[in-house]
Amino acid sequence: MHKRTFDLLLLVPTAPVFFPLLGGLALLVWAVDGRPVFFSQPRAKKHGATFSILKLRTMTCDDDVEARVPTRLGRWLRHHGLDELPQLLQVWQGHMSLVGPRPLKPDDVERLAQAHPAFRERLQVAPGLTGLAQITQVTGAQRTAEVDAHYARRHSRSMDMRILLRTVWVVLTGFGAR
């Protein structure tokens, strides 16, 4: 079974829960923090192609990037990983997978790959909504590069299921979140 098929087999039956939840959270962001509701930014995907990642907006919209601060809902959304929920649409579209290395900005991939060559291996698989580096709580670019490279070389459906189950646990309990 291909990874894309695996993603869709998990996404389709959960869509009646996740998509109304996404709609409700979008309405909540709009009601509490105003517009825009979503934030998008270019990210690198498989083989270095780019796409625009979509998140619920969690920061103020100040023109000065340095002056931006979390919105009233932003801290809570981020803590529970709910700002990432719009990326389920990008899994649906095939830009992302449920599990894989988290997508980085293209210039960050290039900069980090020069310092840590293992970072290039992450581009051999689709970026994910969650990943091995996230559930193992690694810190530092070198260690993240190693964990992402390990995932790119050895990923399997059983590994993806373990990562997804651990992610659900973190989202529901807040335990183990970084």
Predicted regions located by residue number:
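A hydrophobic, helix-centered structural microdomain
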Residues: 1-60, 162-178
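Short, solvent-exposed loop/helix junctions and linker helices
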Residues: 2, 18, 67, 78-82, ...
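C-terminal terminal-structure detector
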Residues: 8, 121-178
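Short, hydrophobic secondary-structure boundary micro-motifs
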Residues: 25, 39-40, 99-101, 107, ...
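Conserved catalytic core of Hanks-type protein kinase domains
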Residues: 30-31, 79, 91, 138
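Short, glycine-rich, amphipathic interfacial segments at transmembrane boundaries or analogous
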Residues: 36-76, 129-147
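A short, structured surface patch at a secondary-structure boundary
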Residues: 67-126, 164
